[in-house]
């Protein structure tokens, strides 16, 4: 029998607390660029391994570093003078022994990784010439033999945990969390870019809620070629402000929402957040995997969080990735139950044990006033057991890109 613990949590729900802080680093932020590349490389390797061998081989590509380039932005269009440098690191199965033929088969790990990284950058950074403005250096090496052995022992079985680690998830998102998340997603949507192409991809949204007032502070790169002067820059800022105000009315009805964009700008000196490429990575701002958003897309100091860098870790047995995603999936389903205000889930693994048999799966529930936790407990356990029984579905969701890791 699995060790699933369900208990009532006697604390104020997040919406009833006096303050709340929420952050999201957008797709063009250097840290998020690294997260996105790491995950894209992992998915590409999964597909390559599956095509060649019908199974996913050992890999972890969660070590991506970005070193900022050098640019000279100016109204009407500036220039990149030094490229952005991206290091792909980590470990992967680069060769296997064909026992029937008694020969070593070399696998195209490096070329697969570089191709995946380039394709991701071209998709996300609309104003970057990836072939000219970016150097991609692949240094992915062969995996550790003991961890490869854990992989080998689990073929045709439920995978064995590669580490003793934990995952954390909660649901539902608060109004502030949804507003922060959806603001960045909207500003980086095709719809918005087509209407206001000057908006770059490097967007950071910080939300502060004080009672029924939410203050959004948005750092938003503006692409220089689309603005001829400071007046056109101001117009872009005001257009975006109006768009975010309209979005806030839909998401945060009943709240006073105050919006600040690029608060470090000095219009008199014409010192503003102007970029050539739409990302601060062009000008010395560096990035790493795992320094930004958690798997639910947010940084939430008022909620439980794991410090695990999920992006790029293998989706087969790396519990640091799987359990964080799984915890959120379980929490979301439990939060839909009648009588549940909030749900918090923590899952602990034990290295070498099947990942569908965690050492502990802890569920904390804030209930509606008239509901007893004893009535909710069996349903919550049923949901947790169902997800654990179908844990291989989580692997599939990750490989197909159906769940986010940042």
UniProtKB/Swiss-Prot annotation:
One Pfam family from the record: AdoMet_Synthase
Key word Transferase present: yes
Pathway participation: Amino-acid biosynthesis; S-adenosyl-L-methionine biosynthesis; S-adenosyl-L-methionine from L-methionine: step 1/1
Domain of life per record: Archaea
Cofactor section: Mg(2+)
EC number(s) given by UniProt: 2.5.1.6
Catalytic activity: L-methionine + ATP + H2O = S-adenosyl-L-methionine + phosphate + diphosphate
GO biological process: one-carbon metabolic process; S-adenosylmethionine biosynthetic process
Binding of ATP, residues: 141-146
Metal-binding among keywords: no
Top EC class, one word: transferase
GO molecular function: ATP binding; magnesium ion binding; methionine adenosyltransferase activity
Keywords, in A-Z order: ATP-binding, Magnesium, Nucleotide-binding, One-carbon metabolism, Transferase
Function in brief: Catalyzes the formation of S-adenosylmethionine from methionine and ATP.
Family to which the UniProt record says this protein belongs: Belongs to the AdoMet synthase 2 family.
HAMAP family: S_AdoMet_synth2
PANTHER family: S-ADENOSYLMETHIONINE SYNTHASE
Quaternary structure note: Homodimer.
Protein name per the record: S-adenosylmethionine synthase
Organism whose genome encodes this protein: Methanocaldococcus jannaschii (strain ATCC 43067 / DSM 2661 / JAL-1 / JCM 10045 / NBRC 100440)
Gene: mat
């Amino acid at each position: 029998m699995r060790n699933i613990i369900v208990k009532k949590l006697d604390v104020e729900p997040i919406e009833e607390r006096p303050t709340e802080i929420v952050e999201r680093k957008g797709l063009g932020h250097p840290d998020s660029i690294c997260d996105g590349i790491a995950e894209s490389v992992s998915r590409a390797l999964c597909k390559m391994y599956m095509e060649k061998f019908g199974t996913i081989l050992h890999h972890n590509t969660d070590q991506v570093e970005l070193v900022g380039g050098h640019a000279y932005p100016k109204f009407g269009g500036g220039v990149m003078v030094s490229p952005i440098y991206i290091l792909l690191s980590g470990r992967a199965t680069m060769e296997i022994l064909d026992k029937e033929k008694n020969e070593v088969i070399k696998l195209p790990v490096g070329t697969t990784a570089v191709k995946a990284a380039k394709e991701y950058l071209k998709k996300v950074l609309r104003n970057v010439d990836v072939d000219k403005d970016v150097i991609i250096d692949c240094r992915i090496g062969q995996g550790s033999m003991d961890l490869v052995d854990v992989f080998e022992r689990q073929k045709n079985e439920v995978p064995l945990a590669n580490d003793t680690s934990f995952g954390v998830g909660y649901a539902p998102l608060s109004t502030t969390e949804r507003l922060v998340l959806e603001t960045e997603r909207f500003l980086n949507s095709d719809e918005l870019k087509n209407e206001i192409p000057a908006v770059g991809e490097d967007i950071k949204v910080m939300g502060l809620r004080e009672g029924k007032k939410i203050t959004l502070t948005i750092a938003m790169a503006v692409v220089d070629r689309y603005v001829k002067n400071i007046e056109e820059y101001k117009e872009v800022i005001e257009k975006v402000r109006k768009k975010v105000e309209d979005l806030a009315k839909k998401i945060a009805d009943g709240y006073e929402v105050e919006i600040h964009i690029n608060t470090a700008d000095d219009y008199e000196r014409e010192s503003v957040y102007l970029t050539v490429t739409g990302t601060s990575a062009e000008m010395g701002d560096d990035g790493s995997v795992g320094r930004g958003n958690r798997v639910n897309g947010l940084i939430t100091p008022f909620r439980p969080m794991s410090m695990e860098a999920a992006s790029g870790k293998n989706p087969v047995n790396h519990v640091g990735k799987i359990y964080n995603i799984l915890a959120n999936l379980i929490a979301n389903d439990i939060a839909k139950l009648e009588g549940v205000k909030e749900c918090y889930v923590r899952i602990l693994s034990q290295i070498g044990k099947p990942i569908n048999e965690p050492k502990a799966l802890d569920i904390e529930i804030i209930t509606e006033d008239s509901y007893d936790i004893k009535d909710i407990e069996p349903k919550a356990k049923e949901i947790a057991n169902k997800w654990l029984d179908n844990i291989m579905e989580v692997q599939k969701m990750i490989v197909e890109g159906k769940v986010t890791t940042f």
